[in-house]
Design a protein with these regions (language model features):
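Boundary/junction segments of secreted and surface-exposed precursor proteins
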Residues: 1-47, 165, 241-242
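Short Pro-Gly-centered beta-turn/loop motif in secreted/extracellular proteins
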Residues: 74, 108-123, 131-132
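Alpha-helical segments with a strong preference for the paired helices of cellulosomal dockerin domains
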Residues: 166, 175, 187-213, 217-242
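Short coil-to-beta strand junction motifs in C2/discoidin
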Residues: 20-26, 35, 45-80, 120-122
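Beta-strand signatures of extracellular beta-sandwich domains
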Residues: 79-85, 125-127
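Extracellular beta-sheet/turn segments enriched in Thr/Pro/Gly and aliphatic residues
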Residues: 1-6, 38, 45, 69-70, ...
Length: 242
């Protein structure tokens, strides 16, 4: 499974890689910040709160008991939430896991949380969510081959209806839209990039050295560069059912 986030993309997407600044600075959940100004983020995957309420314990595998970097791979960009659905409806979800997103777009499942008890003969829509990017879903159902389900979100646009948006095309690669930091204030907040996200940015603008929802670039700081990303995507929405 492969997916890219717009915010941390480097070289305008030409290399298909993202930054690892949150890892480098020690701001990922469970890490020890690398400077005295850094604010530590408690261990645990970040999707145990609204609107996801995912209670998985994948994040417990990464703590300072394993050292200041908490045992994360050195090329970790952030966490994502991955789900499988038998139809486009969220009610058809049969599996959900928190996973690491590596800087080349690879989604790496946490050891011991690799798979769910699912029908290997079934096909599934693959859904990827991120805490401040727009939800995305595979454009077709995907079959399981050799006990593995594979899909490259960067190679083709994702699911969309006549009105909704899939992903953004940057330098030949599709990426998830940045700017969706406020996902709980209204019924459609998790699938829209709008003024609510800008309002959240204002409340945290100037914050630095930690793990923030309005840090769309994923570099540990909330500043005007993050607002500029929101401006680019204001009005974009997904019709992936939530």
């Amino acid at each position: 499974l492969k997916v890219l986030l717009e915010g941390p993309i480097v070289d305008n997407g030409s290399t298909g890689t993202m930054t690892t600044k949150l890892f480098n600075l020690g701001y990922l959940p469970g890490q020890q910040p690398s400077t005295f100004l850094g604010i530590a983020t408690p261990a645990g995957q970040p999707y145990d709160t609204a609107p996801w309420f995912y209670a998985g314990s994948e994040g417990d595998a990464y703590t300072t008991a394993l050292g200041p970097k908490a045992g994360y791979p050195t090329n970790t960009t952030d966490w994502v939430l991955v789900s499988l659905r038998t139809s486009t409806s969220v009610s058809s979800t049969v599996c959900t896991k928190a996973a690491l997103l590596l800087n080349d777009g690879t989604v790496q499942m946490v050891s011991g949380f690799d798979c769910c008890d699912i029908d290997l003969n079934q096909t599934y829509f693959i859904v990827v969510e991120h805490r401040n990017h727009l939800i995305t879903m595979s454009h077709v159902k995907v079959a399981i081959t050799n006990n593995t389900i594979s899909y490259d979100f960067t190679a083709q646009n994702s699911y969309r209806s006549l009105l909704g948006y899939g992903q953004k095309l940057i330098n030949g690669k599709y990426v998830m839209y940045a700017g969706n930091g406020q996902q709980v204030i209204s019924s459609s907040a998790d699938t829209d990039i709008n003024s609510n996200d800008s309002d959240l940015w204002r409340t945290q603008n100037g914050s630095n050295s930690s793990y923030y929802l309005n840090d769309f670039e994923l570099n540990g700081d909330a500043n005007v560069q993050d607002k500029n990303l929101w401006l680019l995507n204001n009005g974009v929405f997904s019709d992936v059912p939530r």
